[in-house]
Amino acid sequence: MATPMIYDALIIGGGPAGLAASLALARVCRTSMLFDSGEYRNEGAKEMHTFLSRDGIPPHDFRATCLQQLEKYKDYAYVTNTKITDIANTDVAPGLKGFKAVDFTKKEFFGRKLVLATGTEDVLPTHIEGYKENWPVHIYQCPFCDGFERKSYPIGLLTFPNPSYSHLALMLRPLNKDITIYSNGPVPTDEPTQTALKMVLAAGVKLDERPVRRLINNGDGPENGISIEFTSGATVKLGMLYHRPPTRSRAANLILQLGLETNAIGDVITDTMMLKTNVPGCVSAGDTQENMKQASVAAATGTRAAASIVFQLADEDGKKALAEAHL
């Protein structure tokens, strides 16, 4: 039986974080196997934004460009389209601790280190008719990613459940002063939320508390936009609607298997500088651990995760050489 290859790192996730980690490792001749499940948070989005030199690029084209550039490093950067279902921190060779990953076909892969960069997914509400049909073509969650191209049209903010929505409302005002909060019923009466609401109303943001019956996709482009139909009164038409659905990790099962520590919303806890987790040899990058879930930030953390692994590998190799030299 052939001895399985042990990569310097296994990278789970084919988004900006995982791709950046693969590139950085290859640049210093460290081998990696990247697993791309084909699941992406920005699936359905027509363009990526706020990514220097790639502003406006379709996500599919961005990934294709990344993979094309990785071909230069084919002796170091390996990529396979599969989904990892099981992961273990275990011996991968006599006296060598590492990670064993198993994909959905039961194929096994081994690595000295692990980059967990599976990302997150948005949990879309199911109780609002038409929401899914408008996401992410007319409903957005990040003004840095989407909005500039539609700034000439009225803006809506769906719900106002807590004070954090005041920041989003005020961030949107420079795009267009015609912005309305559609709270889908009464705004919560707790003091922090009401104080935040008073602040945005004082800034000129309007409030409509009518219950929403359904959201209507009027067609492509802001000139068609999205309409909100209420249980009573006139329908309104907008160029775009902002809403922040909760997110969940795509790798909840892997996080559980490894015993990784997470915060209250399920993101993996890492140290700020080296992105190390509580499991030695495992680092996390991108939306899996980052509060600011954006492509450019994810790519930056992927590079940092790779550097962290390179430092660890170099240190281990040096200590091994010293021990074997008996100096």
From Swiss-Prot:
Homodimer. The keyword Ribosomal protein does not apply. Binds 1 FAD per subunit. Keywords: Disulfide bond, FAD, Flavoprotein, NADP, Oxidoreductase, Redox-active center. FAD binds at residues 14-17, 36-41, 49, 84, 117, 287, 294-295. Disulfide bonds join 142-145. It comes from Clonostachys rogersoniana. Its cofactor is FAD. GO terms for biological process: cellular response to toxic substance. Belongs to the class-II pyridine nucleotide-disulfide oxidoreductase family. Thioredoxin reductase; part of the gene cluster that mediates the biosynthesis of 11'-deoxyverticillin A, one of the dimeric epipolythiodioxopiperazines (ETPs) from the verticillin family that act as mycotoxins. 11'-deoxyverticillin A is required for normal conidiation. The nonribosomal peptide synthetase verP is speculated to be responsible for condensation of amino acids to form the carbon skeleton of verticillin, whereas the cluster-specific tailoring enzymes are involved in further modifications leading to the production of 11'-deoxyverticillin A. Pathway: Mycotoxin biosynthesis. The lineage of its organism: Eukaryota, Fungi, Dikarya, Ascomycota, Pezizomycotina. This is Thioredoxin reductase verT. It comes from the Eukaryota. One of its GO terms (molecular function) is oxidoreductase activity. Its EC number is 1.8.1.-. Induction: Expression is regulated by the cluster-specific regulator verZ. Disruption phenotype: Completely abolishes the 11'-deoxyverticillin A production. SUPFAM superfamilies: FAD/NAD(P)-binding domain (SSF51905).
